[in-house]
UniProtKB/Swiss-Prot annotation:
The keyword Signal applies. Seed coat specific expression. One of its GO terms (cellular component) is apoplast. It comes from Arabidopsis thaliana. This is Dirigent protein 12. Dirigent proteins impart stereoselectivity on the phenoxy radical-coupling reaction, yielding optically active lignans from two molecules of coniferyl alcohol in the biosynthesis of lignans, flavonolignans, and alkaloids and thus plays a central role in plant secondary metabolism. Required for seed accumulation of neolignans. It is found in: Secreted, Extracellular space, Apoplast. Keywords: Apoplast, Disulfide bond, Glycoprotein, Secreted, Signal. The gene is DIR12. The lineage of its organism: Eukaryota, Viridiplantae, Streptophyta, Embryophyta, Tracheophyta. Glycans are attached at residues 56, 120. One of its GO terms (biological process) is phenylpropanoid biosynthetic process. It comes from the Eukaryota. The keyword Disulfide bond applies.
């Protein structure tokens, strides 16, 4: 009987010791928000399909606005936009932005963005996802969340600061994306 009690006490202390050692040995990865582990500036080029430019279009409206205001509320756009290292649309793309955005405010222009930057260049291979609100009608510079990735950007997190550099009516725009990754593996 006493032998059985010793076994139970020993098992209990061993379990507590193992549990404590596993929690003590886990140290979360720290990162400095002042110094990103990767930083680069890219330019996204969006050419909207207007019924006549099927060969050049990189974005298409899938759901038309419902007429609930003057700010395209309810419009859903699918994209496959080239991303370059400079503002020139004819520059060689280093990535493609693939995904969608939709307008979600009646009182001002605001788009909710969900797209993945797909890299296939000599410098970077992999993807990361940008997902957040883009209040371009309210702010000249907007911070959007980078919420994960693959390849060279495996499980990365960071911020993409968007600045609209050029617009040509509703058919073309160029956005500067200042990418700062704070968690790199």
């Amino acid at each position: 009987m006493t032998n059985q009690i010793y076994k139970q006490v020993f098992s209990f202390f061993l379990s507590v010791l193992l549990l404590q050692s596993s929690t003590v040995s886990y140290v979360p990865k720290s990162f400095d928000l002042k110094k990103p582990c990767k930083h680069f500036v890219l330019y996204l080029h969006n050419i909207a399909y207007d019924g006549d430019n099927a060969a050049n279009a990189t974005a298409a409206t899938i759901v038309k606005p419902l007429g609930l205001g003057d700010h395209s509320f309810g419009e859903l756009i699918i994209i496959n936009n080239p991303v370059t290292l400079d503002q020139n649309y004819l520059s060689k793309p280093v990535a493609r932005a693939q995904g969608f955005y939709f307008y979600n405010m009646k009182t001002n222009y605001n788009a909710w963005v969900a797209w993945t930057l797909v890299f296939n260049s000599t410098k970077h291979k992999g993807t990361f996802t940008i997902m957040d609100a883009n209040p371009f009608g309210l702010q000249p510079a907007r911070d959007l969340s980078i919420v994960g990735g693959t390849g060279d950007f495996l499980m990365t997190r960071g911020i993409a600061t968007f600045k609209t550099k050029l617009t040509q009516g509703s058919k073309y725009f160029c956005v500067e994306m200042n990418i700062k990754l704070y968690e790199c593996y």
